[in-house]
């Protein structure tokens, strides 16, 4: 098995042009325009939602802040107590789609009038660093992030309830010229595992295995945090997962394979 690091768009482009790779383990379908055409053309088949609860985006506060001030877990509570979140919404850098959406949410919610600044970071690195700095000092923090991610594994966060998502309003919220922005949650992103149709036909057993593989965001966050803390490689992290999550992966495979793998881990 050859593992090729990639991302949704280039991996799908490669499948379209060359028929490879055989398996794409993590396709973020909302950011991959080639996905539906390849499905409709019969070149790929969707096996499962590899992130069972989907990729999540939104506005978050640190766990310690939510525990001290549970009212901050709703946007109404945040806007009623702007000083408790540091009078600031930490936003994505200019050029990122999330910056436009978050700024429109801020406009719709009247953040500025309530005393919450829409602070646009200069880079993704400074956005991430602001979370680490807040955690180190146990200071207020409120802003945009996503999961699964290493940051969410290292710094546990609580998502602020912005109200239900209305798909019909999302296009305007994603437009920097939106005249009627809406206060609402981000949609959950469907993240799937796909295989080429040729691979599914020639490797049914392997396809069945991949169809069973699914993780929660919390599981992925914890694995990323462990890998970072230990300075581990991807292979070492896989061994750690197999050694500590036998109940989970044991549900993915048959009895014979489960016994064989368990013996190797002894």
Regions found by a protein language model. Give the residues of each.
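A bilobed periplasmic-binding-protein/Venus flytrap-type ligand-binding module shared by bacterial periplasmic
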Residues: 57-67, 189-202, 223-226
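C-terminal lobe and pocket-closing loops
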Residues: 149-214
């Amino acid at each position: 098995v050859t593992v090729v690091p990639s991302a949704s768009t280039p991996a799908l482009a490669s499948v379209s042009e060359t028929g490879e790779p055989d398996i794409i383990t993590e396709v973020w379908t909302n950011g991959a325009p080639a996905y539906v055409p390849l499905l409709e053309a019969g070149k790929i088949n969707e096996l499962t939602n590899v992130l069972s609860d989907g990729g999540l985006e939104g506005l978050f506060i640190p766990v310690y802040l939510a525990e001290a001030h549970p009212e901050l877990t709703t946007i109404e509570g945040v806007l009623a107590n702007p000083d408790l979140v540091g009078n600031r919404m930490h936003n994505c850098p200019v050029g990122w789609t999330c910056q436009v959406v978050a700024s429109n949410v801020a406009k719709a919610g009247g953040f500025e009038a309530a005393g919450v600044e829409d602070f646009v970071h200069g880079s993704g690195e400074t956005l991430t660093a602001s979370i680490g700095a807040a955690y180190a000092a146990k200071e207020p923090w409120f802003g945009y992030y996503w999961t699964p991610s290493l940051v969410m594994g290292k710094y546990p966060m609580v998502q602020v309830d912005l109200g239900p998502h209305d798909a019909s309003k999302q296009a305007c919220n994603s437009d920097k010229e939106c005249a009627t922005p809406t206060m609402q949650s981000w949609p959950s992103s469907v993240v799937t595992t796909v295989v080429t149709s040729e691979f599914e036909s020639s490797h049914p057993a392997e396809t069945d295995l991949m169809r069973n593989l699914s993780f929660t965001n919390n599981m992925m966050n914890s694995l990323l945090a462990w890998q970072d803390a230990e300075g581990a490689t991807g292979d070492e992290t896989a061994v750690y997962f197999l050694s500590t999550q036998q109940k989970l992966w044991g549900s993915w495979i048959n009895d014979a394979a489960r016994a064989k793998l368990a013996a190797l881990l002894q």
